[in-house]
Amino acid sequence: MKRTRRALPANYDPVYPYDAPGSSTQPPFFNNKQGLTESPPGTLAVNVSPPLTFSTLGAIKLSTGPGLTLNEGKLQASLGPGLITNTEGQITVENVNKVLSFTSPLHKNENTVSLALGDGLEDENGTLKVTFPTPPPPLQFSPPLTKTGGTVSLPLQDSMQVTNGKLGVKPTTYAPPLKKTDQQVSLQVGSGLTVINEQLQAVQPPATTYNEPLSKTDNSVSLQVGAGLAVQSGALVATPPPPLTFTSPLEKNENTVSLQVGAGLSVQNNALVATPPPPLTFAYPLVKNDNHVALSAGSGLRISGGSLTVATGPGLSHQNGTIGAVVGAGLKFENNAILAKLGNGLTIRDGAIEATQPPAAPITLWTGPGPSINGFINDTPVIRCFICLTRDSNLVTVNASFVGEGGYRIVSPTQSQFSLIMEFDQFGQLMSTGNINSTTTWGEKPWGNNTVQPRPSHTWKLCMPNREVYSTPAATISRCGLDSIAVDGAPSRSIDCMLIINKPKGVATYTLTFRFLNFNRLSGGTLFKTDVLTFTYVGENQ
């Protein structure tokens, strides 16, 4: 009998026919579809599938899950407290009197337990589902409210501020001689000054006139003296008479002295008598009252102690025989004129007082040459930040470098992005709300040394980003090498640093955000020691 040749498989390789072992052609023969198999090839084994498996001793066993157990070779349910098996092999409650109780929102009706549904819930094909109301239309914001991302903010002008979460007007203080009343600012003027047509002017005293024996020469008043009188050491004295001589109307004839009389006089019975003169008339300011002649004093003059004096009002006084104006604080005399005293930062332009602009000198704010660990991430100081802001003309130049410490000393390609933020108030002073907030190592750099002057100045504002130019956040990105000197500038040792200008942040007026990106360009762990980064932006106005 001729043996039938077995057909070869389609993938049979006559060159390398031994890749996989073939089935055994030796007895015993078996049907692999009736519980037996070759595993491994050439070895007869029992073909089992879950829940049947083999024990550690090679015996066939039944795998059991939770709630099932084997007891003396029999599979049975594992019963918990309160459950038993009755005589019919059914699982039942051990004590029917101990039934389950239900509380809201569960309710039992005969043999059915149901769930009470309130608003916002519904039963959909036996599944509890939450129903959501139709969402309202999106909110629209109009100026002065602005929306950036998920934040609504209110831009503030210089005259406004936020205190304890409330919007208010920034109070303005005024020093004498300026005074604020209600909504007006006025200049308090003392005696001798007045405001005419919104200009400060001096009140001129009335002109003074002098009658003999008083006479005025330039700015001096003098007393004219006649014979027998003189002024010595500022006092009026009588001079000794010269030898007795007689002049008209006296006449000496030998030892007789006679009086020559003229019109209006005569000698009668050895007595000098007056002949009635014609009636006298008096012109203003002289007036005759009965037998007295008096001087009538007009406005600005008065008679005191028998003397004619000038009446002085507020702002005028008698000083060393002259009348002068009395000036208060903030005023002075210069070249016989009353002028306002001006302190630093004030000048007079077109007859009005105005503040002067400070000279445009370069200003530098910095952390000092060797700052402390002043950068915080998750409230932990881990970055040593050197930052220098220099205002020259209208531009501010930023020089910065960063060195990691602790957990950020070495960074890897899986490092997450992170930001270091400086927040400033409306005066350009560093706030404590950012994560670069060490005010002990932030201030102004003097010209002559490398110290930090932390005392704030009104010029610090000049180093801030111009809010009108950067009314919305602006950004610039720069390639940043890490440990460049040690790795000789290898391109696989660089990341990106993005400077974000004036990104809204809390109550801060100005912000500078240094964001470090693209760590996945690193080829491995690298020392976080950045190159010196340089940025430029337009500075704020004074």
From Swiss-Prot:
The keyword Oxidoreductase does not apply. InterPro entries: Adeno_fibre, Adeno_fibre_knob, Adenobir_fibre_prot_rpt/shaft, Adenovirus_pIV-like_att, Attachment_protein_shaft_sf. Induction: Expressed in the late phase of the viral replicative cycle. One of its GO terms (cellular component) is viral capsid. SUPFAM superfamilies: Fibre shaft of virus attachment proteins (SSF51225), Virus attachment protein globular domain (SSF49835). Pfam families: Adeno_knob, Adeno_shaft. Forms spikes that protrude from each vertex of the icosahedral capsid. Interacts with host receptor to provide virion initial attachment to target cell. Fiber proteins are shed during virus entry, when virus is still at the cell surface. All late proteins expressed from the major late promoter are produced by alternative splicing and alternative polyadenylation of the same gene giving rise to non-overlapping ORFs. A leader sequence is present in the N-terminus of all these mRNAs and is recognized by the viral shutoff protein to provide expression although conventional translation via ribosome scanning from the cap has been shut off in the host cell. Belongs to the adenoviridae fiber family. The tail region anchors the fiber to penton base capsomers, whereas the shaft, built from several repeated motifs, allows the knob to protrude from the virion. This is Fiber protein.
